Design a protein with these regions (language model features):
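Conserved pre-ATP/AMP-binding loop-to-beta segment of ANL
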Residues: 20, 148-167, 174, 197-203
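AMP-binding/adenylate-forming catalytic core of the ANL superfamily
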Residues: 91, 108, 358, 363-364, ...
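A short helix-loop-beta submotif of the ANL/AMP-binding
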Residues: 59, 65-85, 89-93, 101-107, ...
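ANL superfamily adenylate-forming
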Residues: 28, 113-159
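Conserved AMP-binding/adenylation subdomain of ANL enzymes
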Residues: 186-203, 211-250, 264-265
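Conserved AMP-binding A3 loop
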Residues: 32-36, 163-187, 494
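Conserved AMP-binding/adenylate-forming core of the ANL superfamily
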Residues: 23-67, 71-75, 92-97, 183
Length: 507
């Protein structure tokens, strides 16, 4: 079934012949949807999309609440050979103007509450039509689905054909549209399914957003390719997740999920029967890893990926899940470390730029051939921009982004080294180390620190706490105490924002 469509075939084949198996239970509404019902709805939508003028290769932009019908729309888009373009629900109309103008989608799907504002933007950008879907799953998208019957014949798509465009977070400069092929998405989900031992007996708690790689191409694709089930939440809800754990086997989350769940009563009992906890999208503190293990008896499995590649490395399912690392390269994926100036491989144990090659790597940046050539080598290696080390046991350590590297007085300083020391100080919840302009050194080190609740921290105390452990040129010149670090919607600390905030500290 769906044999001619590379990705759709692989999303469907695990559930063939098991139409009555539960695919999704919505934990807010209580509605249950079987695999047969889910794919029938996707086929209805695919028919409706084609009737609305969607052609193979057209983009379908989506900025709407997390609902089941959005997953149906994703599969429907794949079925009709179009390109799925999910957009962060936090983007303003002004921000959407850039994405719609750049991608030039055929259709935009949005929340009915924003339709009036976004129609004007869509019209200006040449979008042919606007469909709506609300958090209650009512709207013109649902009407389009319900007006058609199942039985859609999928459009033929090969492994190299485009399946999705995901825009990078754009924390520094213009967002880039990463083009992801049928083959890239299919191969990565199949690899993760096997590496993490997902089967049709698994029940995943799905609380991640679906405009992002983690929630859409990892959580959703892996579940579909395993023929498993998911317990579906519109967003993170600690109480709902705890209530669901006794019926579930796996949870995928960002570090914030785990820190908040650690504050909840009853975690140890709720998690007792779980099989797997996965963390990604932002670094997991070793302290969180250790506390989680102490409370639940489970070791969180941390992995490493990005918009352009999906997942690259993972701590092992069997074997030591080492805190502070992102494990080993996944099967079929090569990871090397190179010198940022020369491009030559660096010796084992030294810091270098992580480069990745494999079937998971994107096809390039949408309408940015020069940027593609800069970051995607002719030999297939993608220059991630992340700084890393590979230890003697083969575990990959992420040191930071190359753009976060601090060069002070001619010395290279890696923020992660300082952050680990600061985070270990009594009374520190977390920290972020940045470089800011300095009249003498070009750049200098500033530590932005969040104290633990009730702790009494001082700038002098933090400086004294790291002084004996760091060379003088690495020691922070200033410590800024704050209530919270700025983060994006996936929990990543926004160092670019902090660099702007404190740019004049030494002016």
């Amino acid at each position: 079934m769906y044999d001619q469509n590379h990705l759709a075939h692989r999303l469907r084949r695990a559930s063939l012949g098991r139409e009555d198996q539960l695919f999704l239970e919505h934990l807010v509404t209580g509605r249950e949807t079987t695999y047969g019902q889910f794919f029938a709805n996707a086929e209805r939508l695919a028919t409706g999309l084609v009737a609305s003028g969607v052609q193979p290769g057209d983009r379908i932009a989506v900025q709407a609440p997390k609902t089941q019908i959005m997953l149906e729309l994703y599969v429907a888009t794949v079925l009709c050979g179009a390109v799925f373009l999910p957009l962060n629900t936090g983007y303003t109309a002004s921000e959407l103007r850039y994405f719609l103008g750049d991608a030039q989608p055929r259709l935009l799907v949005c929340d009915p509450r924003r339709a009036a504002d976004l129609r004007a933007v869509a019209d200006d950008c040449g979008v042919s039509g606007v469909l709506t879907i609300g958090v209650d799953e009512s709207g013109t998208l649902a009407d389009l689905r319900d007006a058609h019957q199942p039985g859609f014949a999928p459009v033929a798509r090969a492994a190299g054909d485009l399946a999705a465009i995901l825009y990078t977070s754009g924390t520094t400069g213009r967002s880039k549209g990463a083009m992801l092929s049928h083959g890239a998405l299919a191969s990565n989900a199949q690899t993760l399914r096997d590496y993490w031992r997902f089967t049709d007996a698994d029940v995943l708690i799905h609380a991640l957003p679906i405009f992002h790689t983690h929630g859409l191409f990892v959580a959703t694709n892996v579940t579909l390719m395993a023929g498993g089930s998911c317990l579906f939440l519109p967003g993170f809800d600690a109480d709902a997740i705890l209530d669901a754990m006794p019926r579930a086997t796996a949870l995928m989350g960002v570090p914030t999920f785990y820190t908040r769940l650690l504050e909840a009563e009853g975690l140890a009992e709720a998690a007792r029967g779980m099989r797997l906890f996965v963390s990604g999208s932002a670094p997991l503190l070793a302290e969180t890893h250790d506390r989680w293990r102490a409370v639940t008896g489970h070791a969180i499995l941390e992995r490493y990926g990005m918009t352009e590649t999906n997942m690259n490395t993972s701590n092992p399912y069997d074997g030591e899940r080492r805190a502070g690392t992102v494990g080993f390269p996944l099967p079929g994926i090569e990871v090397i470390l190179t010198d940022p100036q020369t491009g030559a491989k660096v010796p084992q144990g030294e810091v270098g730029i992580l480069e990745v090659r494999g079937p998971n790597v994107f096809s390039g940046y949408w309408k940015m051939p020069e940027k593609t050539a800069e970051e995607l080598r002719e030999n297939g290696f993608f220059i991630t921009g992340d700084m890393g080390q590979i230890d003697a046991d083969g575990y990959v350590h992420i040191v930071g982004r190359s753009k976060d590297l601090i060069i002070s007085g001619g010395y290279n300083i890696y923020p992660k080294e300082i952050e680990l020391l600061v985070d270990d100080l009594p009374g520190v919840m977390e920290s972020a180390v940045i470089g800011v302009p300095h009249p003498d050194f070009g750049e200098t080190v500033v530590a932005v620190v969040v104290p633990e609740a009730g702790a009494t921290l001082t700038e002098d105390g933090v400086l004294a706490g790291v002084a004996d452990h760091l060379a003088r040129f690495k020691q922070p010149r200033r410590v800024i105490l704050v209530d919270a670090l700025p983060r994006n919607t996936m929990g990543k600390v926004q160092k670019a924002e902090m660099r702007k905030t404190y740019a004049d500290l030494f002016a």
